[in-house]
């Protein structure tokens, strides 16, 4: 049988990213401190932060189009009328806006200020929607999905997509 599937080409551009740490030769030759490990760790953190920012908020100019970009980014997100106006219903709508095959392993992405607001959300019986991890390595969840924080996610404000889910 014939299917309705179609394919098209997408150009994935490469973008340059660099960082620099000045280290003296004296410090490099110091055997007491693992400077190479430290520098390597710092490179990883810096580049990781820049990539996280670009993949979330990038505008397509010398960086990828981020998932929060107004054109080419995510079509659906939690947007509110104002500060502290997120509702449980909006979160449920966001979860079910994602197709079922992708929903099971999806996570919420938000900043710490938004986490603080979500932790205060309650259901009709006064029970918190937020579920802290029961064991040491268990993640916190809301509506059964893990929460990931990013300093690059916008805060809750009128028109901002302050929560991503996917």
Regions flagged by a language model, labelled:
Residues 1-166:
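Structured, hydrophobic secondary-structure cores that serve as assembly/anchoring elements
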């Amino acid at each position: 049988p014939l299917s309705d599937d179609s394919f098209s080409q997408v150009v994935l551009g490469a973008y340059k990213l660099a960082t620099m740490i000045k280290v003296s030769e004296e410090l490099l030759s110091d055997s007491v401190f693992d400077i190479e490990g430290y520098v390597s760790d710092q490179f990883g953190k810096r580049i990781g932060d820049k990539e996280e920012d670009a993949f979330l908020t990038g505008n397509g100019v010398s960086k990828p189009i981020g998932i929060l970009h107004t054109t080419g980014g995510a079509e659906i997100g939690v947007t509110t009328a104002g500060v502290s106006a997120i509702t449980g219903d909006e979160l449920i709508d966001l979860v079910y806006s994602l197709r079922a095959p992708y929903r099971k392993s999806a996570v919420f992405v938000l900043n710490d200020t938004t986490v603080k607001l979500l932790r205060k959300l309650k259901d009709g019986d006064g029970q918190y929607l937020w579920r802290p991890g029961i064991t040491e390595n268990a993640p916190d969840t809301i509506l059964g999905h893990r929460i990931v924080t990013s300093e690059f996610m916008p805060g809750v404000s009128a028109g901002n997509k302050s929560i991503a889910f996917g």
